A protein has these predicted regions:
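N-terminal glycine-rich anion-binding loop in soluble enzyme alpha/beta folds
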Residues: 2-39
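Active-site histidine-anchored catalytic micro-motif
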Residues: 3, 27-32, 44-54, 59-69, ...
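A residue-level signal for conserved active-site and pocket-lining positions in enzyme catalytic cores
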Residues: 9, 70, 133
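N-terminal auxiliary interaction/assembly segments of multi-subunit proteins
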Residues: 35-46, 148-149
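Anionic-ligand-binding alpha/beta catalytic cores of soluble enzymes and soluble regulatory domains
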Residues: 116-149
Length: 149
């Protein structure tokens, strides 16, 4: 049985978190999802790192952690960052390539891959991308097949 944690700046006043969870439950029957927080101030990946770091070490090995912070939709500049999948110990951390992981740990990860962000910027597209990525991680797809080292 897989365990996925969610840390986002999406809040709880609309449908976004529920839609992500619904799609995860549909694609991954039996998965357990734990909310670390959805009340991170918008785009504040430093606060997200603080909250996540203080919860991360209490989760069992093989947990997959998804951090969705620092993704400003409808940006018109080219500061759009891709995603990182970081193997830290026996767990996986999925986060933006924005320095988040370096705020969580000073240790080098066992493995890390970069996944290029899409040109399409929408919540629906991001949700679909993340659900597919989490599906691949739950089914132990090698990191090297997901992105570039």
């Amino acid at each position: 049985m897989s365990l996925i944690t969610l840390t986002t700046d999406w809040g709880l006043t609309d449908h976004y978190v529920a839609a992500l969870k619904g799609e995860l439950f549909s694609m991954l029957p039996g998965v357990n999802i734990v909310d670390i927080s959805h009340q991170i101030p918008a785009y504040n990946f430093m606060k997200a790192a603080f909250v996540f770091k203080n919860a991360f070490y209490f989760f069992p090995p093989h947990t997959i952690h998804l951090i969705c912070v620092d993704k400003q939709l409808n940006r018109t500049d080219d500061t759009h960052t891709g995603w990182m999948v970081v193997q830290y110990g026996e767990s996986m951390i999925v986060c933006r390539n924005n320095g988040f992981f370096t705020l969580v740990s000073k240790q080098e990860p066992l493995k890390a891959v970069y996944i290029e962000g899409s040109e399409e910027v929408s919540v629906a597209h991001e949700k679909s991308f993340l659900v597919t990525l989490l599906h691949d991680l739950v089914h132990n797809k090698p990191l090297e097949e997901l992105g570039q080292p």
